[in-house]
Swiss-Prot record:
Full protein name: Small ribosomal subunit protein uS14
GO cellular component: cytoplasm; small ribosomal subunit
Annotated InterPro entries: Ribosomal_uS14 (IPR001209), Ribosomal_uS14_bac/plastid (IPR023036), Ribosomal_uS14_CS (IPR018271)
Keywords: Ribonucleoprotein, Ribosomal protein, RNA-binding, rRNA-binding
MF-aspect GO terms: rRNA binding; structural constituent of ribosome
Organism: Prochlorococcus marinus subsp. pastoris (strain CCMP1986 / NIES-2087 / MED4)
NCBIfam families: PRK08881.1 (NF006477)
Domain of life: Bacteria
Function: Binds 16S rRNA, required for the assembly of 30S particles and may also be responsible for determining the conformation of the 16S rRNA at the A site.
Length: 100
């Protein structure tokens, strides 16, 4: 189980990403459309002025059951341990143990 503070930090990051998503996208569109280097520099400074945690790359996928950051399957949002446990218990519809 991950520390509660780490899980809370990730929740805070997700809120910041959601809050600044439109502003960040509009600034990035302006930046890509600008031809003048000075104009690009000015827009880049505005982007840098946004909170660091509002960048989507800083959000880490975590298991929703345990909060673990590693070995998380995107399709389920579960870490490998929880995926195995829940699949064996039949809690994941459509997931069956393979045999050949």
């Amino acid at each position: 189980m991950a520390k509660k503070s780490m899980i809370a930090r990730e929740v805070k990051r997700k809120k910041l990403v959601k809050k600044y998503a439109t502003k960040r996208k509009s600034l990035l569109d302006e930046f890509n459309a600008a031809k003048d280097p000075m104009e690009r520099l000015e827009i880049h400074r505005k982007i840098q002025g946004l909170p660091r945690n509002s960048a989507p790359t800083r959000v880490r996928n975590r298991c929703w059951a345990t909060g673990k950051p590693r070995g998380v399957y995107r399709d389920f949002g579960l870490c490998r341990n929880q995926l195995r446990l829940r699949a064996h218990n039949g809690e994941l519809p459509g997931v069956v143990k393979s045999s050949w």
